[in-house]
Amino acid sequence: AKDLGMTTVTVGGKSVSMKHVALTIGTYPDSMFGVHGAGGGPHPDWVSYSSSNLVVPAHSLVTMTINQYDSGGPLNNPFFANVFGTVGGTATIDGKVVTKVDPSAVGHTFTLRGIPQNTTPLFVSVPLPENFATDTPLTIGEGQYSKPVVVTFSFMTGSKGVYNWNCEFPCGGSRIGQFGEAMSTYGYMSGTLTVK
């Protein structure tokens, strides 16, 4: 995470000073962008996030930017078209502040949740709209991509712990409900957030 210094936020009606960090990741229609190895690794055609293991400080404000390069479609569960757990209950998509997106045009989601041994509950879920662009002017690694849909949001961490995140859009293929392949293989559409 990139250190942005200290910031003041309102928590429970009180001003609180806390560390502010930034993370930037991407979602891709394939694995050709670099992190899975030359030629896209063992599954070059699988959708993927650019990073699996994210690390941020405890008791901090985290501002995430997700560059969404992939197409999409309808969610299995429209619940995940809503923004949850962010500062103000909002996300900014290509400069527009939103609380939800069209559930029939989602590319992926970033859905973060606690695991049982964590003492601090945390649930953040942000829909990443479908990228309708058809041109591919950007070269990243060995892949060709369109200009991304840029999604930005912030959330606050509590005490130390490890949290799981994943995509809730059915983008994996192969199994019933499209939750196989990339969706069921760690490091493609899932990962961890370690709060230190």
What does each of the following model-derived ranges do?
Residues 1-102:
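Extracytoplasmic entry segments of secretory-pathway proteins
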Residues 86-89, 94-196:
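Extracellular/periplasmic metallocenter environments
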